[in-house]
Amino acid sequence: MAGTTAEYISHHLSFLASGDGFWAVHLDTLFFSLLAGVIFLFVFSRVAKNATSGVPGKLQCFVEIVIGWVDGLVKDNFHGPRNVIAPLALTIFCWVFIMNAIDLVPVDFLPQLANMFGIHYLRAVPTADISATLGMSICVFFLILFYTVKSKGFGGLVKEYTLHPFNHWAFIPVNFILETVTLLAKPISLAFRLFGNMYAGELIFILIAVMYMADNFALQALGIPLHLVWAIFHILVITLQAFIFMMLTIVYLSIAYNKADH
């Protein structure tokens, strides 16, 4: 049982990859990330195309509520033009939420479906892959630099990282180290927070699925309510993690855009 269990867990934690080592490309992560993006674009474009000024349908009401909610958050937290940040925040929340929600699909369904087509390894949750979350966080990192330069100019950027928090030339090396660590900590923490929560959630689903392989009927039966309870709780987790990623992105960009010295 131990060997079978170890192989089962290892199989479910293996990516469909092209290449080896650092340069390996996780094809399953790319596919499901793109699929989540297509779903988001399809739903919102369809609602926009069929939008009516009369009595809206349920889907239009839901989309309008989400858009209004995100726009309100951006308005309250980003003190600058919202024409780019609001759509960005909406895209981040919906895209990350859809990628997270794939974790609610039974752990064996998609791998077994892929196996029918000769694909022996498949991980379906993109946000449980550190390469995906780091990729998104690196994009946020460059946006932070862009909005810092846009707000303060290149000279302001240099000043911020050399004369803060100690406004004296003698502390320039210390200031630079402190501010660089602070800057790099933002995307790293953003990536690992999302990855850690989704990886743990995926692993718990796999461990619960292992219970169905047990020889003990009572243990098999216990897996059903545990699976249901964790799935219900996980709905909160996937929503909260999408919200946190979006919210921290808004806050980081707001800090970068703020013309006042920090």
Swiss-Prot record:
It is found in: Cell inner membrane. It comes from the Bacteria. Disulfide bonds: none annotated. Keywords: ATP synthesis, Cell inner membrane, Cell membrane, CF(0), Hydrogen ion transport, Ion transport, Membrane, Transmembrane, Transmembrane helix, Transport. F-type ATPases have 2 components, CF(1) - the catalytic core - and CF(0) - the membrane proton channel. CF(1) has five subunits: alpha(3), beta(3), gamma(1), delta(1), epsilon(1). CF(0) has three main subunits: a(1), b(2) and c(9-12). The alpha and beta chains form an alternating ring which encloses part of the gamma chain. CF(1) is attached to CF(0) by a central stalk formed by the gamma and epsilon chains, while a peripheral stalk is formed by the delta and b chains. This is ATP synthase subunit a. The chain crosses the membrane at residues 24-44, 84-104, 129-149, 194-214, 228-248. Belongs to the ATPase A chain family. GO terms for biological process: proton motive force-driven plasma membrane ATP synthesis. NCBIfam families: ATP_synt_6_or_A, PRK05815.1-1. Pfam families: ATP-synt_A. Key component of the proton channel; it plays a direct role in the translocation of protons across the membrane. GO terms for molecular function: proton-transporting ATP synthase activity, rotational mechanism. It is a multi-pass membrane protein. The keyword Aminoacyl-tRNA synthetase does not apply. GO terms for cellular component: plasma membrane; proton-transporting ATP synthase complex. It comes from Actinobacillus pleuropneumoniae serotype 3 (strain JL03).
